[in-house]
């Protein structure tokens, strides 16, 4: 359903009982609400959560912001490398405000907040800006600053799909996902293809511009200094990370946990930048512990 949040129209989905424990899920860069693994959602619902998920601004059926344009990512990346300010059309703090607006629209004063990859960065911003609304914070496969990404993956991301057709987008997504998946738990190709096909078809049906991911990349680069602030976070914190993550190196998760008092860090051997079905039950057990379920 569509709601108004932070001055934008956002697409959200709420699952679980009205009296369930509210859990707001914040996805990664360019991710839609359907991109959360079905198995993870099922386990969380079985745990008694009321799950709120959404399409980020600039993604899926949420409001597109193509009128903001896209500054040169190579230029902005170089500026970030030498400590100059990054020209981002919007910030991760704006995206955290989107998430807060969703809770406000639903009449939820407090929630457990969980994010992965870029979503985990937004969760940190959320906890800093809205501690009174944050029952706990779970960061999965994310970083305290700009992620340390393997060079070949960065190069492919800069190249992007060869064109905007479904076939080109699927080929690109398959290649990226095969590069970042868990080496100890490789996702079957048929399951990966079906998952990505569903996501791309939904995005095309929503007539998303395809440039939202670029603006979100700039938001990540702009927020590189977050590591100097997160020591201020005083909410129960869980950090989950795989030690074979080529997209966001495990050092990012370790750094988050080292900077936040009382944070629990759980490292999964052989896990990359995805959600292996084999590890989801253990991940959910950790989430249950941090949320008190």
Residues of each region from the PLM?
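Conserved HGGG/HGGXW glycine-rich cap/lid loop of the alpha/beta-hydrolase fold
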Residues: 8-82
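Conserved acidic catalytic loop of the alpha/beta-hydrolase fold
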Residues: 83-89, 93-111
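Short beta-strand/loop motif that positions the catalytic acidic residue
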Residues: 233, 239-241
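Acidic catalytic loop of the alpha/beta-hydrolase fold
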Residues: 244-248
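N-terminal cap/lid segment of alpha/beta-hydrolase-fold proteins
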Residues: 1-9
